[in-house]
Structure formats: C-alpha cells, structure tokens
Amino acid sequence: MASAGKPALDDSRRGTGSPKIKGRENAKDTLCRNITIYGRCRYEDKGCAFNHDPHKVNSSNQSDSKKRFNVDSPSFTPSLLSSNGSSPTSTPATTKKMTTISPKAANAAPFQPRSVVSRSNASTPGLRQDTVTPDWTVAEVQEFVPQGFDNSHLAALQGNGNGPITSTSPFDPFVTTPTPLSAGGAVGPVQPNPYSHDAAAALGGAAFFPGAAGFQQPVQYHLYAPIGPHNQNTLGYQRNVHDLFLPNDFREELQKKAAATLQTLPNTQLPAQIDYFHSLVPLDLNHQKNATIFGFPSWVYKAQSSKDGNYYALRRLEGFRLTNEKAIRSVQAWKRVCNGSVVTVHDAFTSRSFQDSSLIFVTDYHPLSKTLAEQHLGAGQQRFQGRHNVQHIPEQILWGYMTQIANALKAIHSNGLAARVIDASKILLTGKNRIRLNACAIMDVVQFDSQRTVADLQRQDLVNFGQLIVTLGANSPTVMHNPTKAMEHFTRAYSPQLKNSVFWLLNGMQKDQDRNIDVFITGISSQLMSTFDSALHLDDQLTSDLSRELENGRLVRLMAKLNFVNERPEYEHDRQWSENGERYFLKIFRDYVFHQVDAQGDPVVDLGHVITCLNKLDAGTEEKITLISRDEQSCFIVSYKELKKALESSFQALMKPARRMH
C-alpha cells in the first residue's frame, strides 16, 4: 500500500515545483518609479521598459485581483466525505481522483456564508437540509456608523481605567441624524459643549463615564451673575455701580440696626450687671410708669450676654414678688414655641439689682423695632390731624397683620398655651409689614393662680385678636369703648370679607359653634396665599441683593493679598525679596489699577476699571497689558496669568516660617 502511493507523491511534487527567477518580462505592468517620484520619466522615449501610465496599472491590478478572487467561481465540493470522523483508506486510484474536480461542479450553486443558524436548525444538527434558504444576507445588514466619537479623545478615554469604551447613547442632542445607526449619511465629529462642566457631557455623551472621572472646570468667579428679579430700565450691556452692591436704602437700614445693636449708654444709673447680662441700654420711649396690661410697671432694656456675647431684650416687671416657684417654671413651655411671628422667650428669673424685687424675662432683641401702637396709633399723629384727615391702614396691610397673628396663635395654641396679651403696644413691627407677638409668657407667671382653663383663654385670644384689628382699622386706641360705632366705621372703610372675619373673631366667646384658630385660618385661606406670595417675592429680592455682595468679599481678599506683598519696608535690603523681579510687576500693576491719571494729569477715579482689573487678575486671563514704570523709563507687556502666578508665589514666600521669623 505504501509503495503504491509513492508515484502519486512524486507526481504532485514535480507539479508544484518552485518557480524560476524571471527577468524583466513583466516590467511593462510595473509603474515607473520616476513617475511616482518626479511625476514624469525622461527616459520614457529612450527605451525605458516600465509602464508610464498609472491608470493602466490600476486597471491591470483590478483585473488580476478579479482573476485571483472571483465570487462567481463554483463552490468547493469534496469528492469523498468521511463518516463519523474516520479517515478513508488511501489508494492510488482514489488519490488521483481527489486531485481533480468533477465536471458537475460547474452547475453548483454559488457559495454563501451561513454564520447565523436558526434555532430550529441548531436544535437538530444531525439533519441535513439541501434546500434551505439563508436566514439573512449581507445586503440586509446596515453598515455600522459610530456617533459622537472623536479619535483624538481615544487615548484620554482609555487612560481612565474604566474598561472598554461603551457605545454612545442614541439620544445624542448634538447629532442631527434621524436614526442612531444610519448607513446612508456620514456623521462628523461631535463639537464639544463649551457650557458644560462635565467632560463626558462636553463631548455630547460620547464618553459615558461618571462625572467624577472627568476634570471639573472651575466656576468663573470673575463674572458677576445677576440673579433676578430685574426691574431696571437699563440696556443689556449697561451696568450701574449699584448693581454690584446692596441697595442704598437696604444698606442704610442694616447699618442703622448694627449701630443700634452696638449702642452703649455711658454714665448711666442702671446696674452694671444683672445676672449674666451687662451693658444695659433702656429701650422705652415713654418714661412714665404704666401698669395697665400686666398689673406691674414694666421696662425694657437691651443687654449683652456674658455666655454667648449676643444681645437680648430684658423686660423687667417692677415690684413683683414671686410666691410660687412653679409659676416661673411655666416659662419652660414657652421655650418650645419656635415661630417666625412670635418673639422667642429664652429665660426668666428674679433679681434685686434694681434695689427692689423684679421679675426679668429674656427674649430676642430686634433692633429699631416699633410697636403697632407707635406706628399707627401714635399720639403725635392724632393730635394735629382733623377728623377728615385720618389715614386708614390699607386693607392689604391689615390682611398681612391678620395672617401673621393667626400664624402666631396657631403655634401657641398647638403647644397647649394661650397668648393672653394681644395688644397694639405689645406687638413689634420689625420690618416692612413684618410683625411679631411679644410679651406672651408674662401673664402665665403673673396670673399663675388663675382658675380659667386653657380652652377659655384661647377663645379669649380670638376676641382680643378681633378687637386689635378694629382698633387698627379705626386708627384710635379708644375706639372699643363704643363697639357699635366702631364696627359701623370699620364696615364703611373695608370689604365685607374683612368685616365678616372680624365679626367671627369678636364672637369667639360664644359656644354656639366650634371656634378655634384652625377654623379661622380655613376661612382666610385665600388671603394666606396672597401673604405667602408676598413673602416669596421678598425672599427673591433679598437673594438678589445678597448675590451682589457675593463677589465683593473675594475682591477684598485679593486686594489684601496684593497689599501684603507690595512695598514691604522691612525687606527693602533683602536680596531674596527684591522688587526687581516679579514683585516689581506687582508694584507697577497696583499703579496701573489704582493710580491712573488722564491726559491732563488729573487722577482717574474709576470703580469699574478697578473691579475689571481685579477680576481679570483673579481669573488669570491671557489678556496682556502694558505696565509703565513710575519714571516712564521702562515698559513691560505681561498677561494677567503671569501676574497671578507672581502674586501667588510672592504670597507663598511671605508665608514661609523662615520669612515670618526674619
């Protein structure tokens, strides 16, 4: 068997011998190198054997490739199939037969790949189906076109160590193709979003990594962000100096409150210290004793605490003697009342610092606050006004007072307490139409032995509430001496809704129906929404005013750092602190910012120029400026980026321990 197979092997080896080295018989199909290098060949007409037509070479290559790879060639069909993986027995006859192709192969179907097999075919691999149509063809598959990916970012994305790059999201706002995989249109690289602080979002979602992996761009602190509301009639490019600071009226109000808080009274006859309070300043405008409300003369002082350094209001009841220790403990329940319409009570104690037995209540201090009696029922206003010149309080302001008092009573009654003192002389006006109930806990101590129930006292609060509104509406503290006439006057001045609400409060002691503060709040819910909307507008205004001062603190710190470095006399002869280098730039930069003069030599006081230069210095922009020395003999062109670097290095050198010990 072995000897019979040798002649076939020898024939096959002789048929596939190594090719001989040929000469230049195929030079006519090779493009001349002179054409490739110089574009022409000087020996083309002098016997150059190579081809000088590039188009002819390309066409010949294409025809050659067609000869080598032709999809129309018949598919390969083996002559003998092995069964169960066993190799057939080789014979000389069969060997010669296997080296040839049957003539029937010319009529065979063209070869088509079957890389995808249906589930039905995969479940029965042993069955052979001769007439099976392919499940899919190459033409049905759409060409893959990547979206939102730029090759320039490939190295940066692979360097994050987050594994392979995931596919981009089909919902890309920067890609205008209608489908996520479009074979017809080509998609260019995605333009980065310049307003995004996320590296992945800047690429339009191409790099879908977590935001923490990307570099977070710093906030542009040198830009002032004008937060609304905006009610000015200026153009978009116009800015006022007042846009960068608080409004003048608001600033003056805050400064006056700060001055009133820090006010002291020298050479006073008041005690130097009461318990842990000192620096007493009287707050009463009327020096006459009045015991109408509490049954004892009361005085109000401002004092500073030795414990926390804050300022508090001390209300003193003159001549009060405590007979029951449980009475003063009732103040502990008022400490739990935390409401914006109630003055917070902090402590209560007795003292003999005024050479008598006094009861002291410690509450929050609101500087420059007035009472409603001083604001609307002042004696000076009523003395010189005739009957027809009385200015009624606007109804919207009265509704604002009612909603705030209702809010205070809601908090007090929810804690099982009663205000018991709802009087115009004991309600503080701490801001524009902003009121707070005051002196609420005093009656619980003074009248501790009272037999009235809490429910009865809460209904009495409703009656006192209604009487207060009628008194304010009539602008007269004695109007309730004649209730019928007072209500007739109130009805003529205000709307039926306000009148009905006041009538309901005045009938609070009647037990014909359930009368409490919750029922009253339900009845005035529409006005509560109006007051709430006004509070939201005020919050927006305060936020806008606060945003103006947001960047000014940063500029102050920058100016302080600049002045720390410039012209230090103790380092004048220190070579390491010479002003010939980068510190000299900072010195003449200060002259550029603050010491400019006009053409006539007059000083230029331009706040906008100062703020602009400091903001550019803090941002470290690439903008270049011209700095001229004081003797006008030297001129330097530097950028804000270089100035910022010089300022930081100089300040760090100043902060070194060796420098501070020098």
Curated annotation (Swiss-Prot):
SUPFAM superfamilies registered for this protein in UniProt: Protein kinase-like (PK-like)
Q: Which Pfam families match?
A: Pan3_PK (PF18101)
Task: State the UniProt keywords alphabetically.
Answer: ATP-binding, Coiled coil, Cytoplasm, Metal-binding, mRNA processing, Nucleotide-binding, Zinc, Zinc-finger
Region called Pseudokinase domain, residue ranges:
263-525
Q: What does this protein do?
A: Regulatory subunit of the poly(A)-nuclease (PAN) deadenylation complex, one of two cytoplasmic mRNA deadenylases involved in mRNA turnover. PAN specifically shortens poly(A) tails of RNA and the activity is stimulated by poly(A)-binding protein pab1. PAN deadenylation is followed by rapid degradation of the shortened mRNA tails by the CCR4-NOT complex. Deadenylated mRNAs are then degraded by two alternative mechanisms, namely exosome-mediated 3'-5' exonucleolytic degradation, or deadenylation-dependent mRNA decaping and subsequent 5'-3' exonucleolytic degradation by xrn1.
Please give the record's comment on domains.
Answer: The N-terminal zinc finger binds to poly(A) RNA.
Record lineage: Eukaryota, Fungi, Dikarya, Ascomycota, Pezizomycotina
A biological process from GO: mRNA processing
User: Which segments show compositional bias classed as Low complexity?
Assistant: 75-102
The UniProt regions of compositional bias labelled Polar residues, in chain numbering, are 115-133
Where is the region Knob domain?
A: 565-662
Q: What is this protein called?
A: PAN2-PAN3 deadenylation complex subunit PAN3
Coiled-coil boundaries: 526-564
Coarse class of the primary localization is: cytoplasm
Write out the GO MF terms: ATP binding; poly(A) binding; protein kinase activity; zinc ion binding
Per the record's keyword annotation, is Zinc-finger included, yes or no?
A: yes
> A GO CC term?
P-body
Cited InterPro entries: Kinase-like_dom_sf, PAN3, Pan3_PK, Prot_kinase_dom, Znf_CCCH
Q: Where are the zinc fingers (C3H1-type)?
A: 26-55
